[in-house]
């Protein structure tokens, strides 16, 4: 059986990257929440 996680930098950036997060209202909310919490890594 093939495992579900097949890492790819391109796919990772395109689905979870900072720019993608900033595109939608919900994504911006995620970034805002992570900033408020004090996360060092805001996206990916």
Curated annotation (Swiss-Prot):
A single GO molecular function term of this UniProt record: structural constituent of ribosome
Taxonomic superkingdom: Bacteria
Key word Ribosomal protein present: yes
Keywords attached to this entry: Ribonucleoprotein, Ribosomal protein
Classification via Pfam families: Ribosomal_L34
Single GO cellular component term: ribosome
A biological process term (GO) from this entry: translation
Keyword Protein biosynthesis: no
Family: Belongs to the bacterial ribosomal protein bL34 family.
Protein name listed in UniProt: Large ribosomal subunit protein bL34
Gene: rpmH
């Amino acid at each position: 059986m093939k495992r579900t996680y097949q890492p790819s930098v391109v796919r990772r950036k395109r689905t979870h990257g900072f720019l993608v997060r900033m595109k939608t209202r919900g994504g911006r909310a995620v970034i805002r929440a992570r900033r408020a919490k004090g996360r060092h890594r805001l996206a990916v």
